[in-house]
Amino acid sequence: MAQSTVESKNRKDINNGKIPAKETILSPRFYTTDFEAMENMDLSINEEELEAICEEFRKDYNRHHFVRNSEFEGAAEKLDPETRELFVDFLEGSCTSEFSGFLLYKELSKRIKVKNPLLAECFAHMARDEARHAGFLNKSMSDFGLQLDLGFLTANKDYTYFPPRSIFYATYLSEKIGYWRYIAIYRHLEKNPDSKIFPLFNYFENWCQDENRHGDFFDALMKAQPRTVKSLSKKITIGGSTFTHPLFDYFHRFRYFLNNLPLTSKLWSRFFLLAVFATMYARDLGIKKDFYSSLGLDARDYDQFVINKTNETAARVFPVVMDVYDNSFYGRLDKIVENNKVLSDIANSDGNKVSKTFKKLPKYLSNGYQLLRLYLLKPLDSKDFQPSIR
């Protein structure tokens, strides 16, 4: 049998074990970046704020927070089989996501510590937090007789390269959206304790503050590196080998000019906001809908709240944000969810691969069209939008 990323400690206790979730476009990703560019960053523009955030990290407010108590004893056995499967799937995805953050931050802290010690220390503290989160989630999985094989994940996961600019945008949004997701669940369960299916959720209030501090760090880092956020590398990498040439420098300067146009940063802001929002919405209203129902949450209302709040938060650092209040915004996201349901039905139906591909094509085209229309929606200028959220 092929090696699994999930190890069963006692498979008979969980209906002969859980098959690891199949990797899809909606699955958590593992990232790498240009470490040389990161270590050469000049932080002087906003070094004072970064030092203040690093001091917050040093205090490690949640050092003693992630300690399990007696509430965990027997909690797994109280869940019915359907809820158990939904919750284990949530644990697996969340643990993988946290572990992905740990690997990126840890590698950054090691690679840049000589030339950029302040930045390296910040990443080391965030790696500490992400490792703590992943370990706590993995411990909860052990209550169900399972554990993620994190070593296997490290060695066998495909790593996606993102330049520093993209890492800043994507990770900032990931941390901030994580804050709003956790605090929304915590507040809902605080008001509806009967829907709290597992004691893990008692930890979400303090947990989300780690996510918030991480997001604040990337906010400060982007303010310290406005050029790096908008520029591109002078090096070209082909087949693992790096090449430089004087012509690359001229080409780089032209691309640098384009990337420093005000319009460019606005386009990137819209791209990453839409990518994060659409991915979350499609996942939560598609494959995760029943999980939120088990918590007494309506997935659509929950996601719209989280998206609206994250969009407001992003206005503090991005030049523009999405117009989530446009009547068509959520309607088009709902259409993508509908298309994905049809695509899933086709994939699980009888028929050969060729016929299935032709049946899927209209829905793929429709999804592309919906995303394009969403991207082309007139954005909200952050300088006009910000006062309403402060």
UniProtKB/Swiss-Prot annotation:
Free-text function comment from the UniProt entry: Catalyzes the formation of the isocyclic ring in chlorophyll biosynthesis. Mediates the cyclase reaction, which results in the formation of divinylprotochlorophyllide (Pchlide) characteristic of all chlorophylls from magnesium-protoporphyrin IX 13-monomethyl ester (MgPMME).
Source organism phylogeny: Bacteria, Bacillati, Cyanobacteriota, Cyanophyceae, Synechococcales
One BP term from GO: light-independent chlorophyll biosynthetic process
EC number: 1.14.13.81
Catalytic activity: Mg-protoporphyrin IX 13-monomethyl ester + 3 NADPH + 3 O2 + 2 H(+) = 3,8-divinyl protochlorophyllide a + 3 NADP(+) + 5 H2O
Keyword annotations of the record: Chlorophyll biosynthesis, Iron, Metal-binding, NADP, Oxidoreductase, Photosynthesis
Family statement drawn from the similarity comment of this UniProt entry: Belongs to the AcsF family.
Pathway: Porphyrin-containing compound metabolism; chlorophyll biosynthesis (light-independent)
Cofactor dependency: Fe cation
Family matches, as HAMAP family: AcsF
Entry-linked Pfam families: Rubrerythrin (PF02915)
Species per Swiss-Prot/TrEMBL record: Prochlorococcus marinus (strain AS9601)
Name of the molecule in the record: Magnesium-protoporphyrin IX monomethyl ester [oxidative] cyclase
Top-level division of the source organism's lineage: Bacteria
One annotated GO molecular function: iron ion binding
